[in-house]
């Protein structure tokens, strides 16, 4: 049985990470692939839990070996998703969720055209600016640069299968969970999960 591959993307500050974290607490048999990154480890982050932290040299070596399904350079740091890990999880029948940017989503689409891709949008640019400012970790010019990049990123919404507006967190979470549930109820998935039951039901005199 093969699992489903979901991709969740959004511009910086849209609330994607918080939504994914809450989703994992509500949905069973959904695994998030831990990305590899050359970014420095932040306080409270654990290697192998939040990211697989690595050097630029090691990262680029894995790129040459086709070790990543997708990778991208974001604000001077590299991020990538292990191809072997994702394929192993899917082969075991586990559903996998990738929390990556739109560039990575495009790369995933080329390898896994059947992947279900979800894009999160903020309710307004004003709201997005407030979220970026409330982080309290960046200078004003950095915030303006990130907002400009976010506007460009949001133009990629047309390349995704689902759009969720993160205006109300609980509603957005419900919408995200609904996408997972609806895809699990598709014919192909249900036949895989319940093939014995279905065979019994459609076989005459099989009570």
Curated annotation (Swiss-Prot):
EC primary class: transferase
SUPFAM superfamilies: P-loop containing nucleoside triphosphate hydrolases (SSF52540)
Keyword RNA-binding: no
Keyword ATP-binding among record annotations: yes
Protein name, UniProt field: Guanylate kinase
Function, in words: Essential for recycling GMP and indirectly, cGMP.
Keywords: ATP-binding, Cytoplasm, Kinase, Nucleotide-binding, Transferase
Residues annotated as binding ATP: 10-17
Family: Belongs to the guanylate kinase family.
HAMAP family registered for this protein in UniProt: Guanylate_kinase
Location(s) in or outside the cell: Cytoplasm
Domain of life of the source: Bacteria
